[in-house]
Amino acid sequence: LNSYTRWQNNTPINSIQAPLGIDKQGNILKLDLHEKFHGPHGLIAGMTGSGKSELIITYILSLAVNYHPHDVSFIIIDYKGGGVARAFENRETGKKLPHIAGTITNLDTAEMNRALISIDSELRRRQRVFNKARNISGESTIDIYKYQKLYKNGVVDEPISHLFIICDEFAELKAQQPDFMDQLISTARIGRSLGVHLILATQKPSGVVNDQIWSNSRFRICLKVQEKADSMDMIKTPEAATIKNVGRFYLQVGYNEFFAYGLSAYCGASYIPTDKPKRKVDTTLNFIDDVGYITKSIDDEKEQKMASCGEQLSNIIDYLIEVANEEKIKVRQLWLEKIPALIYVEDLVKKYNYKSEVCEINPVIGEYDDPANQLQNILTVNLNHGGNLIVYGSTGSGKNTLLNSLIYSTITNHDSNEVNFYILDFGSEILRIYEKAPQVGDVIFINETEKVNNLFKTINQKMADRKKLFAKYNGDFNYYNKKSDKKEPLIVVMINNFEAFYE
């Protein structure tokens, strides 16, 4: 395939053509989503069993083989069971086509919103990068084609790819997440000059494809559809309803500026490695009869080489991964993996190489996700400078877990000379486990009224003593600990289930 050579030689500045299959004459039929040809956006229709998903997979792979990941990247949205997305990203093995910038395979509202925020963030980032490039180059306007030319010429140093957003079976997306679909179409329209291409695939266009989608779809590919009306909707002719064979399709661009009948290429066939020319010793074993005729020949090496090595698709992806790794090529991921449901303090500390400072009580309580800035980081609470803290949450939301993490993270990093906890657990009494910790003065429960009264008398006395002690240090606890030769511990009064305490 010589893909790295192809990546070096092929540039999407003037054309983004990629083989899709063959036409009626047996010539290679190419789809070119450059805005001067068939692009930037389009529709694909085909009933179940028509070969629609295979055509999409073939097109993605064709682009990936021919264009550098810095020139072309993909977001795959797949609700048909994840077949298209899984073809290019195996989350179990970690293998992923180098060109993949993100995949969505379920209709979880939170995940949809997260992805949409990330896509919008990417558009804003591209606008900033293009504005910077305009100032550097002196160009009056910058679009994706001009920017990529500047990058190829070394004027700018950050690659920006054509971003293909491909949605297989968007009818379900539109039905269950209509706002997301509307935002996606709007994003594609706004992002046209920024290198965004939207390809929507459906089984039946009628009632699903609205005027906004039609008006923004320059090319249309129609495989076998169930009814003539569907074919008429797509390509203004009933011919697609009479298609007999899987993978056959009609391609229409604009108002019949280009019209062709073709057969999609197929990349799911078995991959059989071809022999490479080399000098070899003949190890063939021949069986002959009594008069010297060969009755049977066995060549173990040849038979071993002719054995199938899986699908062509997976082998080509493995090859492209290898090429990208050798050249240290990485595509910018538009969103990170979602934060897992269960995380441990120790794992977060290790993951982010977090180190606690002496006398800075800044316990780890979790990890935060910021899709707008395509960022995840460790989440801490600064008890020295943050003032008081209120934790809200319904039953079962994780309040106890948060308090537990806060205490645990604090006492594993700070001794009793730095911090003292006084805990009033009027809830499940889960915080009882900290009773014997040296940093914990006491853990008080709901029926221990006298202990509660004594605690607040003690706290009031400590406040009065510290007011005098800190007088020469601007009345500030942190300033005292920084400038004085003595240190005072931070006092943390924690009330779990404040409603019960208040009553």
PLM regions and their residue ranges:
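Long, structured protein-protein interaction/assembly regions in large complexes
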Residues: 145-149, 217
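Phosphate-binding and hydrolysis-coupling loops of NTP-dependent motor/remodeling domains
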Residues: 1-34, 101, 209-367
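P-loop NTPase catalytic phosphate-binding loop
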Residues: 4-141, 154-229, 233, 241-242, ...
